[in-house]
Design a protein with these regions (language model features):
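Conserved DHp (HisKA) dimerization/phosphotransfer helix of two-component histidine kinases, i.e.
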Residues: 50-100
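Conserved catalytic submotifs in the C-terminal HATPase_c
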Residues: 107-117
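Acidic ATP/Mg2+-coordinating residue in the GHKL
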Residues: 165
Length: 229
């Protein structure tokens, strides 16, 4: 797989989730407009005016952050290898995937955000790989919902980032092919069969690997093994 394929997948994936991002922006924009209208009509009180202004400022800052992070992730770039915080990347991905999670009635369980999970690689590419896995797990629970659990465990110089869903698992006949470029069991045009292959390509480029297995209680566990910092 070449870099061009990764960037094409990046544009396709973020084009797909732009509705969810716009939904997040709309939520904060409603706060801005609502409090702006309230300030126009309400009577006295410097305190109330200040409270309204603070709400507007907070919502505006959140909108700016969403747009900044989205632009940062979608922009093509040459990968770099540098230390970064996994928790920071994950918090940004939550915003991007929240709409899909809500629509699928999926609850996302995250590791302790205060845990010092630091790794070395390209943060944007790592985020792309993880986002592909998160959305894949969300789709595995389509129609019934469930819990998507993200974990992080340090072992022998590598972080094992796990994503466990509560779907039906992967058929043994399909399991050997899930990381093949273009392989998909879905018919929708938005599913190109490139999510897991791109994730594998990115993680391999970091000096790690990715694997998948069915869980005894049902569902699938995907593990991204990446170098710790």
């Amino acid at each position: 797989m070449d870099r061009k394929a990764v960037e094409q997948f990046r544009l396709a994936l973020f084009g797909r989730i732009v509705m969810g991002v716009s939904h997040e922006v709309d939520n904060h924009l409603s706060v801005v407009l609502g409090f702006a209208e309230l300030l126009q009509v309400m009577g006295g009180g410097e305190k109330k005016a200040l409270e309204g202004a603070e709400k507007i400022l907070s919502a505006g800052e959140k909108i700016a952050a969403i747009i900044k992070h989205f632009s940062h992730y979608v922009r093509p770039h040459a990968p770099v290898g540098e230390p970064f915080s996994f928790s920071a990347v994950l918090s940004e991905l939550v915003v991007f995937s929240r709409y899909d999670l809500g629509r699928g009635n999926v609850t996302l369980v995250l590791p302790d955000k205060d845990a010092a999970v630091r790794m070395r690689g390209d943060s944007r590419d790592t985020g792309l790989a993880l986002l592909a896995v998160l959305l894949n797990g969300t789709e595995a629970m389509a129609g019934k919902g469930g819990t998507l659990t993200v974990g992080a465990t340090l072992r022998e110089g590598f972080w094992h980032i796990t994503v466990a869903d509560q779907g039906q698992g992967i058929s043994p006949g399909i399991m050997p092919r899930i990381f093949e470029e273009g392989f998909t069991t879905k018919q929708e045009p938005l599913h190109s069969g490139m999510g897991l292959p791109v994730a594998r390509h990115i993680v391999s480029g970091m000096g790690g690997d990715i694997s998948a297995e069915n869980l005894p209680a049902g569902g699938c566990l995907v593990t991204l093994r990446v170098p710790a910092c």
